[in-house]
């Protein structure tokens, strides 16, 4: 499976085309809209989320609520486009009209794609860069993730995400929660945190950053249960599932790090405390005493829960802008200001769920049969029986 997205932040719409989704998957707009709404929530979001009412339109690949096996096209309209029709229109405009708009951007923002992208593509108006590099694009990545989650659900895999840290405020580790319990708690938290004791402290940190014209980042974690043993590969570097998951996390806007299992903590412990001892019994088959590997060894699943974390830096658009240089005059200026969030970590957690879900669904479809859901389900059932008796 693969997908490609298109569209600009203030353009008419965002589009994603999904290829390779098996036939026979139950899929309706409500499944996708639920995920889009989750992305819009979270303490610290900016005014843009008050403007947009993200809903999906399914325009191909689905008939009467069931996927056909052909490419699926999903569209999300940008409600704010009505205020940007001239600025972001596709038709040519005169030089006078261009000057009258006064929205040309020549002062790149530190931390964004602005300067590097302008140099790469030769854009003298940095808006040509920021409109596409904007995290608004993650709207349709969440839509794609919603389709992947539906695949996982029908294949017996559950997934959930939560926030571990915001602006240096850390949640304590809470173990032995089911995926359903994690989902219930986080859906009722403004910061998608499991630890109610630090929830308000996280919100206070966000509010302080906002009032100071600043921004803060954090850490999110995604957990998936129900993956069969041996999904992925040790044979080639580009088929290792842990590599794909880390790459997916790093592809999210403003993410600067990824961990699987105990992650970087493994460097501080001896092997005897890191590696997960193997157990077997007639009821469960092969299992592990611990899950420090985060459900992945040698690029393949172990059958234990997948545990992936991502580190999000503070959003680089600041209302108290940093120093920059005008690309036309080369004079020192403060960077341009665009409407933005003070903290998007809770929303980014939803995006992280989506990209992890896509990689897991892709791996299952690739390994157990590509064409139709019924065949994939049968093959997974047979594989699980085989693995248990191996």
Curated annotation (Swiss-Prot):
Keyword field contains Cytoplasm: no
Binding residues annotated for FMN, in chain numbering: 132-134, 253-254, 298, 313-317, 339
UniProt: NADP(+) binding residues: 39, 45
A Pfam family per the record: Chorismate_synt
Domain of life the protein comes from: Bacteria
Entry keyword set: Amino-acid biosynthesis, Aromatic amino acid biosynthesis, FAD, Flavoprotein, FMN, Lyase, NADP
Cofactor, free-text remark: Reduced FMN (FMNH(2)).
Cofactor(s) needed by this chain: FMNH2
Pathway(s) where this gene product acts: Metabolic intermediate biosynthesis; chorismate biosynthesis; chorismate from D-erythrose 4-phosphate and phosphoenolpyruvate: step 7/7
MF (Gene Ontology): chorismate synthase activity; FMN binding
Parts of the chain that traverse the membrane: none
The reaction(s) this protein catalyses: 5-O-(1-carboxyvinyl)-3-phosphoshikimate = chorismate + phosphate
Residue ranges that the Swiss-Prot or TrEMBL entry lists as coiled coil: none
Enzyme Commission (EC) number: 4.2.3.5
A GO cellular component annotation in the UniProt record: cytosol
Ribosomal protein found in the keyword field: no
CDD domains on file: Chorismate_synthase
Family membership: Belongs to the chorismate synthase family.
Quaternary structure and interacting proteins, as annotated: Homotetramer.
Stated role: This reaction introduces a second double bond into the aromatic ring system.
Protein name: Chorismate synthase 2
Gene name for this UniProt entry: aroC2
